[in-house]
Regions:
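Bacterial N-terminal signal peptides that target proteins for export
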Residues: 1-4
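Classic N-terminal secretory signal peptides
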Residues: 6-8
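C-terminal motif of bacterial Sec signal peptides marking the signal peptidase cleavage site
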Residues: 11-15
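Functional surface patches built around histidine and acidic residues
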Residues: 16-164
Length: 164
């Protein structure tokens, strides 16, 4: 019985997260090299933005303003991460959202995609997905882009939305 109790206590100790570990996560370094924003495929991103703003305007919503700074730097960083994974991912969205909020954003949303080779095709896919459409039609004022093409020609997209 003593051995069973000791084994149970060891198991419980191994599966618990300490307060120190939580604190480390909460104070993660959210700094970014703003020059990463320059690595996005701006002609493709501008076309995506034009299509999204046309859609928003048709609904009576204000268009989004492109953020060529922090939001795009974080979007490019995430797109590079997805390219490394060779798949789309929302991993660490909370960190990107927190970083943008630290820079004045009130609310933040994100759409990701891969494999679309035109702006129209990725926007159509997002509009046909309720959760992605919600971001496109959301109460946001600005947007940042991480649009990148791999060596094999496959596009990856990260679009961050935020309200100032």
């Amino acid at each position: 019985m003593t051995t069973s109790l000791l084994a149970l206590l060891l198991l419980l100790n191994a599966s618990c997260t300490t307060e120190d570990a939580i604190e480390t996560i909460e104070t993660a370094d959210l700094s970014i090299d703003i020059n990463l924003a320059n690595e996005t495929d701006w002609p493709m991103a501008d076309e995506v933005l034009q299509l999204i703003n046309e859609h928003r305007n048709n609904l009576g919503l204000s268009g989004l303003t492109a953020d060529h700074g922090y939001a795009s730097a974080y979007a490019v960083d995430h797109t590079k991460y997805m390219i490394d994974l060779e798949r789309i991912s929302d991993d660490c969205f909370a960190d990107r959202a927190r970083a943008l909020k630290n820079n004045g954003a009130i609310s933040v949303g994100e759409n990701v995609a891969a494999g679309f080779d035109t702006a129209q095709s990725v926007v159509n896919a997002w509009l046909n997905s309720p959760s992605h459409r919600e971001n496109i039609e959301g109460n946001f004022t600005h947007t940042g882009f991480g649009v990148m093409q791999t060596d094999t020609g496959r596009y990856y997209f990260t679009q961050l939305f935020y309200k100032k």
